[in-house]
Structures are given as C-alpha cells and as structure tokens.
C-alpha cells in the first residue's frame, strides 16, 4: 500500500499560488477591448471620392455580396451612385479589398457587427443623394 504524505497536495498548491500572481490571459469584454492588428479583417470603409465604380470588387466577391450602382456624368464617365453589401453572406476573405485598383474599399477595426433583425445586416456604404443626369442608373 502506498503511503500518502501530502506531497501531491503541496505541489498543486505551489502551482496555484505561482499562477495566482501572474497577469490574467483573458480580458473583461466588453469593458476592455484588445488592440487589433492593423491588417484585421473587420467591417468595411468605402472612400467614395476614390471609387471609380469599376465593379472589380463586385466581380471578385465569391458570394456576390457587393452591389455597385453607377451613373454616367456629362463627360460620359461612370460615377458611383450606390454601394451596398449583404453582410450576412460575407466571408471577410478580403478579395474585394485586394481587387480595388484605387484602394477605395478598405477594412476597418470594427468587429461588433451583430444585429437583432436580419434587415439591419445590409451595409450601405454609399448612396448618392441627388442624381443630376436623366439617364438613370446602371450596374457596373
């Protein structure tokens, strides 16, 4: 029969007391939020002044999440009319961001994207207020 002299208990308590004084690994979310790396794939930001409404981001998206609406101005150049994303289908893969030739579409640090209603998941990044041409809109 084995003799129990309490060495196992003392080893366990020593480990517990050693870990007790270390910095905790977890954060008290949502009171404290961790700093995210710069290349984090969060939500999206569209710099509408840079966007040329080429539609490359729309074509690059594997789930067809992006809808780019465009109009033609007086010089017959395409201008951005609307930019919408169905976020419920987005994989956050970044192919749309990589495809943008002018870096108009970028990721931001926002990651709290949960919504209560499914209708609120649609992300409208740009909607032109006034349409100056009478030609209407076309998809890029």
UniProtKB/Swiss-Prot annotation:
Keywords: 4Fe-4S, Cell membrane, Iron, Iron-sulfur, Membrane, Metal-binding, NAD, Quinone, Repeat, Translocase, Ubiquinone. [4Fe-4S] cluster 1 binds at residues 51, 54, 57, 100. Transmembrane segments: none annotated. The keyword Acyltransferase does not apply. It is found in: Cell membrane. Its EC number is 7.1.1.-. Its main location: membrane. PANTHER family: NADH DEHYDROGENASE UBIQUINONE IRON-SULFUR PROTEIN 8, MITOCHONDRIAL (PTHR10849), NADH-QUINONE OXIDOREDUCTASE SUBUNIT I 2 (PTHR10849:SF24). NDH-1 shuttles electrons from NADH, via FMN and iron-sulfur (Fe-S) centers, to quinones in the respiratory chain. The immediate electron acceptor for the enzyme in this species is believed to be ubiquinone. Couples the redox reaction to proton translocation (for every two electrons transferred, four hydrogen ions are translocated across the cytoplasmic membrane), and thus conserves the redox energy in a proton gradient. This is NADH-quinone oxidoreductase subunit I. It comes from Carboxydothermus hydrogenoformans (strain ATCC BAA-161 / DSM 6008 / Z-2901).
């Amino acid at each position: 029969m084995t003799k129990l002299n309490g060495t196992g208990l003392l080893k366990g308590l020593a480990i517990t007391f050693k870990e007790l004084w270390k910095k905790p690994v977890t954060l008290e979310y949502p009171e404290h939020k961790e700093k995210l790396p710069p290349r984090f794939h969060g939500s999206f930001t569209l710099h509408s002044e840079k966007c040329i409404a080429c539609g490359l981001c729309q074509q690059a998206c594997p789930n067809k999440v992006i809808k780019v609406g465009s109009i033609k101005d007086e010089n017959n150049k395409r201008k951005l009319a609307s930019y919408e994303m169905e976020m419920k289908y987005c994989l956050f893969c970044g192919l749309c961001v990589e495809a943008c030739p002018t870096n108009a579409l970028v990721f931001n640090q926002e990651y709290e994207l949960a919504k209560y209603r499914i209708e609120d998941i649609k992300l409208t990044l740009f909607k032109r207020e006034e349409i100056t041409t009478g030609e209407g809109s076309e998809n890029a």
